[in-house]
Curated annotation (Swiss-Prot):
SMART domains: FolB. NCBIfam families: folB, folB_dom. It comes from Staphylococcus aureus (strain Mu50 / ATCC 700699). Catalyzes the conversion of 7,8-dihydroneopterin to 6-hydroxymethyl-7,8-dihydropterin. Can also catalyze the epimerization of carbon 2' of dihydroneopterin to dihydromonapterin. This is Dihydroneopterin aldolase.
Length: 121
């Protein structure tokens, strides 16, 4: 089964990071979420109750990203994946990618970040 729902390029301002400058100044974080979901029933019925409402998923991600500051992107991603997997039994797998586009690291790059994949058990 290859069906997915994705939320790409969500942007949130937060104060996450291991460096004190990140906690004081803050920065924009880009978040992508991909959910493995069987969409066949929703395709047949045209009813939102047969799928995962991506507006609700956005609000879940927003509450974590704009909430209490943490040190690691890995921790944020785990919280997002755990929240989605616990709230939506239709989701079989959650992939979360978080990017810092302008971290306080010298050099030239488009961004740094992490990506995790967690199965819904």
């Amino acid at each position: 089964m290859q069906d997915t729902i994705f939320l790409k390029g969500m942007r949130f301002y937060g104060y996450h990071g291991a460096l004190s400058a990140e906690n004081e100044i803050g920065q924009i974080f880009k978040v992508d979420v991909t959910l493995k979901v069987d969409l066949a029933e929703a395709g047949r019925t045209d009813n939102v109750i047969d799928t995962v409402h991506y507006g609700e998923v956005f609000e879940e991600v927003k509450s974590i990203m704009e909430g209490k500051a943490v040190n690691l992107l890995e921790h944020l991603a785990e919280r997002i994946a755990n929240r989605i997997n616990s709230q939506y039994n239709r989701v079989m797998e959650t992939k979360v990618r978080i990017t810092k586009e302008n971290p306080p690291i010298p050099g030239h790059y488009d961004g740094v970040g992490i990506e995790i994949v967690r199965e819904n058990k």
